[in-house]
A protein has these predicted regions:
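Flexible, glycine/charged-enriched surface loops at secondary-structure junctions
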Residues: 78-81, 164-170, 233-282, 324-331, ...
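Short beta-strand/turn micro-motifs at beta-sheet edges
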Residues: 38-41, 284-290, 357-359
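Intrinsic, low-complexity N-terminal interaction/targeting segments
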Residues: 28-43
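Short beta-alpha connecting loops at secondary-structure transitions
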Residues: 208-213, 373-376, 439-451
Length: 467
């Protein structure tokens, strides 16, 4: 499972590190990142914003109910799902920080104030639910790797960190990716990637390209923490202020050889993977997911990544009454609800569709996203959510094979897709510029097309079918 598929691309040129640096040290910044969290709130034009980090994306029903209550009593009544499987609350009062933190702590959603911003852990959301295993290609009957268990252990290690090489020096943008072997998390281009490779082993690398190391699955979370510590050590030695591994110049990046030495010092055995090539997989498809144990999971996405508290509560009630009492928030702004009787799954999926969830890959809303836009963001040149909704509701569905599409209110393109090709719809002030981006972030096919809002639906539908 670790070989012979294309590796993930470099970042789009418009989303590369924003400040220049020396070739050896990477970007030089005069301040740390400003990523919001549960404690560091962000003042937006529509009120204060909080980001609640969910390592692995998993919420218990009680935790999920709390978030709905917070959205209703403190926020604007909505929950935004992020591209890393976290939840954001908007429209909060500026003085709510203490109350918000207290309520999150009581439900285990803020286990460590000191480490909140570094708890960025994405994990394969269908792990253990659809029968996939990296061993399946060889006919093995071994159980699949439990990347959710990796996420829980990794989060505990991050929150317990108090060593000399303090992991709190990591940026809020540094991402740990835990992939069960299908390549879905690899496509997010994490900074430290763990991927199950079968037979109780895992591949470990910086970014998504080799060389890497093979470690025992039981050692994987500890190895990931040590990889992050190695990144910090290399960054300090180079004099860089890089937030992410890929921001370091190629000659100044951490190496598998030095990481192997660090693992050995910690009592973790590893073997080299000099030609490591990671698979690129796809996100979960909306619909019913059938498991080998006879139960089903429901996979849905939020329209433009945003749910009302009522929609969220419906999912929580289903999970509580008929499912496993857990919800998995995906990095593709969706939810996976596990553990339903197979015969009940179609009815429950229909109920979610009736409430406004995206439940089919045939929907025009599938793989469509947008930044906050006006009125929430002062930098935005348009109310991109309203324009996107009007465009997608026009009836020009592009089908299950359509490219992802993302509306952005300014050149920053906050939250845009990564990995494969996507349609970039950028507000210009008097319309939109529609561009198909390839895997490297460059333009694919014909040049960008500038249209007014009246012609936007047709332009977007045509761009999404680009091959």
């Amino acid at each position: 499972m670790l070989a012979a598929m294309s590796t993930t691309p470099a970042p789009p040129p418009d989303r590369a590190a924003a400040t220049a640096g020396t070739p050896s040290a990477g970007p030089v910044r005069e301040r740390g990142d400003a990523c919001p969290g549960a404690l560091r709130l962000h003042a937006a034009d529509d009120g204060t914003l909080a980001r609640i980090r969910l390592p692995g994306g998993v919420l218990t029903s009680r935790q999920a109910s709390l978030l709905a209550g917070l959205a209703e009593t403190l926020g604007d009544g909505h929950l935004d799902l992020t591209s890393r499987g976290n939840v954001q609350l908007r429209g909060l009062p500026a003085d709510c920080g203490g109350l918000l933190a207290e309520r999150l702590r009581l439900r285990g959603l803020l286990p460590s104030d000191r480490h909140d911003r570094i708890r960025n852990v994405a994990a394969s959301p269908l792990c253990g639910l659809d029968g996939f295993s990296p061993d399946s290609a060889s006919g093995s009957e071994r159980a699949p790797a439990d990347v959710q268990a990796w996420a829980r252990e990794l989060d505990g290690l991050l929150c317990a960190d108090d060593g000399a090489e303090a992991l709190t020096d990591l940026s809020g943008r540094f991402l740990f990716g835990l992939d069960d072997g299908r390549g879905d998390i690899v496509a997010l281009r994490p900074d430290v990637t763990l991927i199950a490779s079968g037979a109780g082993r895992a591949g470990l690398c910086f970014g998504t390209t080799g060389p890497g190391l093979r470690v025992a699955a039981a050692d994987a979370p500890r190895a990931a923490v040590l990889a992050a510590a190695e990144f910090l050590a290399v960054r300090e030695a180079s004099g860089s202020t890089a937030w992410r591994v890929r921001e370091l110049a190629p000659g100044a990046r951490p190496t598998a050889a030095r990481l192997a030495e660090r693992l050995t010092e910690a009592g973790i055995a590893s073997t080299p993977l000099p030609g490591l090539r990671l698979p690129l997989g796809e996100p979960p498809v909306p619909g019913v997911v059938t498991g080998p144990d006879g139960t089903s999971a429901l996979s849905v996405t939020a329209p433009l990544g945003r749910l009302t508290a009522a929609q969220w509560r419906l999912a929580v009630r289903m999970a509580t009454k008929e499912g496993e009492q857990t919800i998995r928030v995906t990095p593709w702004r969706g939810l996976v609800l596990p553990g339903f009787p197979a015969e009940e799954a179609p009815r429950l999926l229909a109920d979610l569709a009736d409430s406004g969830f995206v439940t089919s890959a045939e929907s025009a809303w599938h793989r469509a996203g947008a930044c906050a836009g006006r009125p929430g963001c002062a930098k935005s040149l348009a109310d991109v959510r309203a324009d996107a909704a009007a465009c997608l509701a026009s009836g020009q569905a592009a089908g299950a094979t359509a490219l992802p599409v993302y509306w952005s209110g300014c050149e920053r393109r906050c939250g845009h897709p990564g990995g494969g090709p996507w349609v970039d719809v950028l507000a210009t002030g008097d319309g939109y510029r529609v561009t198909v981006r390839d895997e490297s972030g460059g333009r694919q096919g014909a040049g960008p097309r500038t249209v007014t809002t009246a012609g936007l639906a047709g332009a977007v539908a045509a761009a999404r079918t680009t091959t």
